[in-house]
């Protein structure tokens, strides 16, 4: 409830301020330290439920559960499809003429939530912040214009690309929140394929993959 105090590990405390319509809360942390410092001290790596349900987090997770592309703080989960990539693999792909581009999406806690509504239209998606700069958008559009294909690595990248795409299948610069919910029947505009991992039943990401498969 608003006004409740929450005690975290490492002597970190916060007061519950506001509950939002999507179920999230705004917390006010005590003390003068930046919230990023407090989270680093008291937080734990938010492993996916299929891992966290089998074991506790350990020190190695901080390195292992991080992609080679990670550059900015803000996401509460790693885009796990990208964990398969290494500098050596990227170099090998480049030698065959396969390029890559990067974008930023701060994955939110909603990525862990199952769909509980009987009708998917009633499911409330959590908004996530993302950014695609103009130069990246231009290069991505040029790939298709020259007969190439765009393969999204992970549902994270796919959601942001589709949020930035217009009905004429062009990707535009994007800087803001997206709450896109892709379900069967959706017409994809930005991508030609997807590389992804397995997904849990009744999850929004499972529905996204079903939409891409035409089911």
Question: Where in this protein do the model-derived segments appear?
Answer:
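Surface-exposed, charge/polar-rich loops and edge strands
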Residues: 1-215
